């Protein structure tokens, strides 16, 4: 009998139910590395594949960071040492976020801190004693409130706090109730300045000046306003750059208006041609020009009313000079050369005696003491000493009992160390902790330091040694703005928020607080990686399900 040969049924290839190592590596690198070692042809191949995926992981996470930036969740922020960092975006403040105060204004509280860095613009507070036992009795937080961007400080008068900030609608001159931090009035106008590199961030830089019931405020693009301090009504306004044909500075106009007698004095950027005026005095009531001086290109410090060599005068720092001008007509009395990289004269000069003035700058420049003599016409300016022991980048120094205290720009590292110098010789007495590129004031023989990381610190002002009393959490985020002090209350702000702490000697103590802020750049990177991983895992699952649903061939 014939038996027909049987043939074996063809064996169907089993469908691929999982992703390839290559695809997994593109979508989810850690899983791709796992598959490489599970499916490896050789250890060497798996090792090379792992190395490639680790390099690719940088690009992978970078794409996640780009997505966070595009969606407005993260942004690039520059620290004082000139390097970018990733931070969470707090968004741009809008007028819809404005909260009106329902608390009575203490109009009898006086008008002491009415200028940038205090009544004399020298960072000294002498109104009342302050509490100095912060270790045992920390300052009590009275209120904290959200705020728009910018580098303005605050002035306080008759129960009102005045500042400037960047809103979505433009620059805003704002008044808050000093009792609760809520709004009283706001004046908005269309303006938004940021430098070409984005290093300074968007927003106004100068601080409003209060004088005799009026507020004088200068925006970063030259908008000068005189407002009624009670209700924000515009008394007069103009753009000083347009009016005088000058050009803006690289980092915007920063100088706070100075009121002397019937004049409000401002600096108007850099000359765009010969004979252009860069220091202007307006009538404080009408805005009419009283005098204008064709001084050199101006820099970022605020003009000061000082007495040197027996003569009251206007002290200004230009791009490459320190100079004294007549208060009556702006004519030069004396000048001396002081050049800094990028023309970045930022820190305030400091009068240390009847005829001596201290000046300092960062970017490797250093500091010097000059003596101004009035024996000749014009005056003479002679150097007493110069060194590099104290380099103020944008944090101005203070003077106490013959010694200068300031934050030294250490260069490219993330540091600004507190330094004490003998004012007469320039000899360093000590160099201590890193407080970052923050700001400081002097009160009751102590240094009040607003640290770059948002902490506040109290240090005894003594040439003997660095004596830290306490360093406590205060604000969230980078803090470059100058603090303000009035009625025994410390006002702090940055580009995100402001806060008020009670530091009167008889005030009840607060809590030390716990800083919850971590390294934001690391947080952003981790979230970017997790975001990409979740998206990659979702795609892998979808691809796997699709392959399993396809019929076998």
What is each stretch, according to the model?
Residues 8-12, 32-38, 506-519:
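Juxtamembrane low-complexity tails/linkers enriched in Ser/Thr-Pro and polybasic
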Residues 3-8, 547-553:
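Short, charged juxtamembrane terminal tails flanking transmembrane helices
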Residues 37-41, 544:
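Structural signal for the C-terminal ends of transmembrane alpha-helices
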Residues 28-31, 52-61, 533:
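Canonical hydrophobic alpha-helical transmembrane segment
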Residues 17-37:
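Hydrophobic, aromatic-rich membrane-embedded alpha-helical segments
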Residues 58-546, 551:
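Noncatalytic, solvent-exposed loop/strand surfaces
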Residues 2-20:
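Membrane-associated alpha-helix detector
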Residues 40-55:
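Membrane-interfacial entry segments at the cytosolic side of transmembrane helices
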């Amino acid at each position: 009998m014939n038996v027909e040969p049987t043939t074996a049924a063809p064996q169907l290839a089993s469908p691929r139910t999982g992703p390839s190592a290559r695809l997994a590596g593109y979508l989810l690198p850690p899983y791709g590395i796992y598959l490489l070692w599970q499916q490896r042809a050789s250890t060497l191949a798996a090792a090379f594949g792992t190395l490639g995926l680790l390099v690719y992981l940088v690009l992978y996470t970078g794409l996640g960071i780009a997505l966070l930036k595009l969606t407005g969740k993260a942004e690039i922020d520059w620290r004082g040492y000139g390097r970018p960092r990733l931070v969470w975006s707090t968004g741009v403040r809008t007028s819809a976020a404005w909260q009106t105060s329902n608390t009575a204004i203490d109009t009898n509280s006086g008008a002491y801190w009415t200028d940038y860095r205090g009544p004399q613009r020298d960072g000294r507070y002498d109104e009342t004693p302050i509490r100095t036992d912060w270790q045992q009795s920390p300052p009590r937080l009275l209120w904290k409130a959200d705020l728009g961007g910018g580098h303005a400080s605050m002035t306080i008068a008759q129960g009102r706090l005045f500042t400037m900030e960047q809103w979505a609608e433009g620059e805003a001159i704002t008044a808050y109730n000093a009792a609760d931090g809520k709004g009283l009035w706001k004046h908005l106008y269309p303006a938004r300045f940021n430098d070409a590199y984005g290093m300074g961030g968007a927003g106004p830089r100068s601080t409003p000046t209060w004088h005799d019931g009026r507020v004088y405020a200068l925006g970063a693009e030259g908008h000068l306003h005189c407002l009624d301090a009670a209700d924000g009504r515009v008394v007069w306004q103009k753009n000083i750059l347009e009016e005088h044909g000058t050009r803006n500075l690289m980092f915007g106009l920063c100088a706070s208006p100075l009121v002397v007698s019937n004049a409000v004095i401002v600096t108007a950027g850099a000359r765009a041609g010969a004979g252009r005026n860069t220091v202007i005095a307006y009538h404080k009531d009408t805005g009419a020009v009283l005098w204008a001086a064709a001084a050199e290109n101006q820099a970022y410090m605020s003009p000061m009313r000082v007495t040197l060599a027996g003569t009251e005068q206007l002290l200004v720092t230009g791009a490459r000079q320190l100079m004294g001008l007549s208060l009556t007509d702006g004519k030069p009395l004396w000048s001396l050369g002081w050049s800094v990289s990028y023309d970045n004269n930022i820190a305030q000069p400091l009068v240390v005696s009847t005829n001596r003035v201290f000046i300092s700058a960062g970017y490797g420049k250093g500091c010097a003491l000059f003596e101004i003599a009035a024996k000749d016409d014009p005056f003479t300016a002679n150097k007493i000493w110069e060194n590099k022991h104290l380099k103020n980048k944008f944090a101005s120094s203070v003077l106490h009992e013959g010694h200068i205290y300031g934050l030294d720009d250490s260069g490219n590292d993330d540091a600004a160390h507190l330094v004490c110098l003998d004012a007469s010789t320039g000899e360093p007495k000590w160099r201590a902790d890193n407080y970052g590129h923050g700001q400081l004031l002097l009160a009751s023989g102590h240094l009040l330091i607003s640290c770059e990381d948002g902490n506040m610190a109290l240090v005894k002002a003594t040439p003997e040694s660095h004596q830290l009393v306490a360093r406590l959490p205060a604000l969230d985020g980078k803090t470059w703005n100058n603090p303000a002090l009035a009625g025994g209350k410390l006002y702090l702000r940055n580009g995100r928020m402001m806060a008020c702490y009670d530091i009167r000697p008889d005030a009840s103590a607060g809590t030390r607080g716990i800083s919850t802020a971590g390294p934001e750049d690391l947080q952003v990177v981790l979230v970017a990686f997790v975001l990409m991983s979740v998206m990659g895992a979702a795609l892998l699952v979808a691809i796997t399900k699709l392959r399993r649903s396809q019929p076998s061939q």
